[in-house]
Amino acid sequence: QYQTKAQLGTYANTLFELKEGAVFGPYKDGDYFRISRLMDFDKGGSVKARHILISYQGSQNAGNEISRSKDEARKEAYKVLRLARGSGSDFSELARTYSDGPSKNRGGELGFFKRGAMVEAFNDFVFSKAVGSLGVVETEFGFHVIEVQDKEDVVLLASVAKKIVPSEATSNQVFRSATQFELSSGKDGFSSASQAE
């Protein structure tokens, strides 16, 4: 699956700078050694957006309380878009007031998502528009007033990982060292023994 820099950890910058097909590693990643090949780089492949859903009677997932027609929903969506574009407007508050969607109580926040996570028309809008863009998109759920909040690049890696497990000899050596340390601390105490180590 595609990953953002934040998901990759210590070597994220190095992995993001690879050319497609290039290999990096081996490198230590937590309890694993990995070798990774960059399979694909998708600029802006993860988008953060929020929306206000204006449903209409007969739209998918519309509750029984929705009585507006499709035309009324379209007009309402463009009214909300004008309000969202107005100076001093608060998109989150508009979502709480106007949205029929499940993200209403979160101010319309959808967080980050990757290509294909949303229905096609919604997906096409957010991935083709610049950060800060506002617009109305029609889907089977109704009319969405959408704001593109942020974009992140993502990479697709093919990795081979091997868990780091100490050998029996290493485990025995650590045990012997710890036992020797314990015995040498004796009456002088832990502090003087630790300084000697």
Predicted regions and their residues:
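Acidic surface patches and DE-rich sequence motifs
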Residues: 18, 29, 139
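Well-structured core secondary-structure elements of compact alpha/beta domains
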Residues: 1-14, 35-86, 100-121, 145-184, ...
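PAS and PAS-like sensory modules
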Residues: 23-26, 134-136
